[in-house]
UniProtKB/Swiss-Prot annotation:
This is Small ribosomal subunit protein uS3. GO terms for biological process: translation. Residues 214-242 are annotated as: Disordered. Residues 231-242 have a biased composition (Basic and acidic residues). GO terms for molecular function: mRNA binding; rRNA binding; structural constituent of ribosome. Keywords: Ribonucleoprotein, Ribosomal protein, RNA-binding, rRNA-binding. Binds the lower part of the 30S subunit head. Binds mRNA in the 70S ribosome, positioning it for translation. It comes from the Bacteria. HAMAP family: Ribosomal_uS3_B (MF_01309_B). Part of the 30S ribosomal subunit. Forms a tight complex with proteins S10 and S14. GO terms for cellular component: cytosolic small ribosomal subunit.
Amino acid sequence: MGHKINPTGLRLGITQEHRSRWYAPARTYPTLLQEDERIRKFVNKKYASAGISSVLIARKADQLEVELKTARPGVLVGRQGSGIEELRAGIQKTLGDKSRQVRINVVEVERVDADAFLLAEYIAQQLEKRVAFRRVIRMAVQRAQRAGVLGLKIQVGGRLNGAEIARTEWTREGRVPLHTLRADIDYATKVASTTYGVLGIKVWVFKGEVLPGQKQQPPVGAAPRRRASRRPQEFEDRSNEE
């Protein structure tokens, strides 16, 4: 019987990059890996309203670099960069080391509706507001199509609309070639907590095919957003540099 592998893990080093970029000896590897997990849990819990798509962590000597890809960078940066200082202090407290050098970069997601995690988060928020799941899926598909994705698959499982028996419903628009390694597949999962229990959400987004060493370009037919004239924002923290 066939089993579905995680599309992100299958394509690491081909079209996907590692979420943690560092090397460590065997004796310290478990400790650093647990630190990464604590950092991600802290960021996703404290800044749940910031629309954080991914948290990338890199380590260089004694410096820790955290890159946050978000749909709303203003929520993280704050007024005059006050949010960056608060975030750094929170990470240092989470790690139990206030002297740890932490460098934070905030990057704005260019196409919010083409990001699998942000789409899954949108679906979860609507389901928690008791919106009918078929309507939510239809709206999510329309948003993704306006963003110019080449293919999209959405799966929702659980007690849909409060049904007594749990079931799984899914829909697919366009191409989603999961067997093609050069296919740029963005995959995300999310859990929606409702009065009838939890609903599991899975989203696959096909953005095109890319060869190793090439950078994925947005499709030609991608519909621009209302704020398309703005350049993607990137806020780089250099406060720890001398």
